Amino acid sequence: DEELLEYSKELNLVNLNPLYIKNYISEINNIYESFGYNDVDISYSENIYPDTNTADLSFVIIEGKITKINKIIFIGNDNIADENLQSIIKSKTKTLKNIFANNNFKKFVVENDVRLLNKYYVNNGYLDTNIEVNIEYLKTNKVNITFNIEEGKIYQFSLIDYLDSKNILNNNINNEIKKIIEIFLDRKNNDYSVEEINKLKDDISNILVENGIDYFEIQALEKIDNQNVNIRYNILPIEPKYTRQINIYGNSRTYDYVIRRELLVSEGDAIYESQLDEIKNKLRSLNIFENIKIVENDLGNNLVDLDITVKEKQTGSVSAGLSIGSIDGLAAVAGLKENNFYGTGRSVEALINTSDNKQQYTLKTTDRLFYENDVDVSYQINYVEQDFSKASSYNLDTFTVGTGISYKLYPKINHSLDIDYNIKDYQITNQSKASTNIKNSSGQNVSFVLSNNLFYSTLGYGFLPRDGNLVSYSNVIETPTSSSNGYVKNIITLKNFNKVNKNIYSIQTKIGNIISLNNNDILTDDKFSLGGRWLRGFDSFGAGPRDSRSSYIGGNNLIVTKLDFSRNIFDNSEFPVLLNVFNDYGLLWENKTKPTNSDNSLRSSVGFGIRYYSPIGPIGLTWGFPLMDEDYDIKRMFLFSVGNIDWLN
């Protein structure tokens, strides 16, 4: 009530002028709409006092319920998938796979979504994109939001050069800059991108700094000719400015040090303009601020005050999802996450992941390793119960306590290093069927595990990547202990997706090897298996070495490749349906003790499927037919999944 009275004063509601009253009601409606209340009913009554020439105004406000988003529709996006655009905008719909999504409708959020979409299109080379939004109000107090998109033509980088009019560069610097520009233009994809312009600008800046040039600015100038864009980097010397004071505003919850550790400067340091964008990007990457503004206040004599104003955002989230499928059965996921725990910038996450054959409980926290660095340190407790009774005649409970560091090695390459303390408890479910090494390990086994991981990805968003590459490498070392033989395990995963017109071609390969450090048998759960998602037409643990149907052994070496062709069979569909045709190949071999059934032979399958991104989540149906198999393999020619995105790729 107090806030509404304040608005009446601001709007000068001091008499019974009908226009003033109408304006006041209109403004109150706008305020309610900004909070998602679009079904507000406002009426008023007058009580006039002739003796004093005054009156009382009584407003009756029926707020109603918050308006919800029913559907989000994209029209005209012929070259960028709905899922990619959906991942960019803040407006969300509620589905079975994200039942805790905030689907409140707010006009200003939709207006910001248009800005985000335009920015995304420009960054992907579409400089002429025009986006209009239409809101359909339903009688159920829900809305359908339609984004009408005219993508326009895609622009390409044509010529990139630089200008050194003040001759501050030497021959060595010139050669280095020319080399990185040449590498940039030799790329396969030269679509215009603001991010790529800034990245190349940063690379040039790094060359200058590494060669002892500290005070400069680089202006990125653009010249457009038809659909070709020429870029010129103008390199100029500047007089250094020194930071007298750094002021931080708006962080009512977040501690100052969380912001200061992301800054590239301290009081007394020289500062130049390119640093301001980098500081803003580093603060934005924390994912705890809605808006960031940095202003230089010039004090004269080459001194400046740096004013950083942030607007904090909600950093806590609840997630939940359900899925059902042939491989995992009924699965449920629930989690809590806070990205700014008590204003420290630390993230805390609790996750429960259960399925028919697996229950997993995880508690994890992540923070910066040291002040003024980009390395994150994490601590994790994990407990997993796995049921291998049908495949290998044992159950396995694993308790893990671990810590690790992670950081960006390059803009799209992440590196992580983890060390874990594992307690494994093997429980034999069938003594006559379980393998000898599993029976010998029955009970608790203790080990230390060191993991080293590299990850590179240019894949787009969505339940099915359209374009891009993924390369990952994992090296795992288990130290020998009194209850563990120890091993070295290496896994390389390669994925390539290419979109040609409406067709999507992909090839995915996984290569693995594990070696015992004591020349002993590797435990079954540490070996590689073949079947299921990576070899369709075969059951999980369906192909490869085994003693019996319920005693799968696995192998020390793995090579598997998936070839896929997908095509959207309905144009302009809000929920895309894709036809998929595939051909899989897999080979699993080598064990110290030869299993009863093991011939080291190649397995292969072909098949087709339907992938449907439905209102309740992704749905996949697959029919696989083995071409090359063995009599002892376990086939599964039909697979389905509802709600599991990972299963589709």
Identify the residue ranges that each predicted region occupies.
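C-terminal outer-membrane beta-barrel translocator/porin domains of Gram-negative envelope proteins
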Residues: S285, G325, S432-V577, V581-Y585, ...
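Periplasmic polypeptide-binding modules associated with outer-membrane biogenesis and secretion
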Residues: D1-S326, G335, E349-K364, L369, ...
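Feature captures outer-membrane beta-barrel proteins of Gram-negative bacteria and organelles
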Residues: A332-N340, Q359-Y371, V377-Y379, F399-L409, ...
